[in-house]
């Protein structure tokens, strides 16, 4: 198995940390994959999952680049620097780096949660040219997402302390739509909170420049409606329902697998279908 190569890339003023998994037995015209990771605790929760997926893809002849957005993970910068416009540019920087390392490849972006949202935003600006987007439960409603993060944050506090601090739940009930300054150990900058508040399904229009596959659960009516609206605009998008045993924000436990095999198989298959 090829050892992934860790490195920094991008402009000197905004370096990004990446891990490149070179393809074994690569052939001209092969697919290469850019992993667009989730935000905060969701990114930490899926770190090992995407590591295993990247290793599997490399063995199958698919070069893969994993990276941390500026101000997150092992990339330079502070959490307070995190915001969607900068991360969108980071994604295109990562795309250009993968193009440099796999020059003859068809590049597919695999974006999970807020990483999927950023993939939509980056792909439509014309600066980078993915052949395909695979969006795994993308965040299409920023306020709904922020409320979920707050609820999970309060639930984590409840399970951490012997005597739960009821002030957190009272605040959640009193201001259900408020944007959190912190969620599950990760700060949300003022700019990011403003951007999430403005994030709606209507603000995430797809383009016809690439194919898009959306993977989500069968009970996610909002994402299904968004995909249907994109199809009504004759965008090349397809919705596929997919259930898995990975809880985005919790530690692994019997009902939340760390690296569910069905999810690995589904995402690997999604590159070519």
Model regions and ranges:
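Short beta-to-alpha linker loops that shape the active-site pocket of alpha/beta-hydrolase fold enzymes
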Residues: 39, 63-73, 139, 243-245
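A domain-start/cap signature at the N-terminus of enzymes
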Residues: 1-7
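Terminal, non-globular segments
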Residues: 8, 18-19, 65-67, 228, ...
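Catalytic nucleophile-loop/oxyanion-hole region of alpha/beta-hydrolase
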Residues: 72-104
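Short, surface-exposed "cap/lid" segments of acyl-processing enzymes
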Residues: 11-13, 23-68, 97
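Gly/Ala-rich beta-loop-alpha elbow adjacent to hydrolase catalytic centers
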Residues: 110-119, 137
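The alpha/beta-hydrolase serine catalytic core
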Residues: 128-269
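Active-site signature of alpha/beta-hydrolase-fold catalytic machinery across serine-
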Residues: 121-125
